[in-house]
Amino acid sequence: MEKVLVTGASGYIALHCITELLKNGYAVKGSLRSMNRENEVREAVKKEIPDNNLEFCKLDLMSDEGWDSSASDCDYMIHLASPFIVGEPKNENELIKPATEGTMRALKAAKKAVIKKVVLTSSIVAISYGHNQKICSSHDWT
């Protein structure tokens, strides 16, 4: 059975991805910043499908620890983990640094583990700050 590492497993989009992956016959390893959220995620998934092929690992966007070992037995990766700040961040260390460094950690671990495919996501947050009077459009991202 092919396995997918889903980072940010407690997030809204991740819960839907995990459920769909399990429904479609994949095993899932979900990463959590805090393992205290495992039961919450497991219960949410169980409302849709049995969680027999769901496991969890602890990963932090700002730490190298665990990334290589977590990815080593996976075939695919969906990188959804990213900090979310309500309101404008005080500085880039709150939002930009964890997002970019976490993405680099995910990609390096995927390369080392020879992951077949990686899916990266983004958010409107990527273009929302620093443009006070601008209406954003598709020209603001690639």
Question: Where are the model-predicted features located?
Answer:
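NAD(P)H-binding glycine-rich loop region in Rossmannoid oxidoreductase-like domains
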Residues: 35-37, 46-101
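Short, surface-exposed alpha-helical segments at coil->helix boundaries
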Residues: 15, 38-39
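A generic structural signal for alpha->beta connector loops
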Residues: 25, 51-53, 115
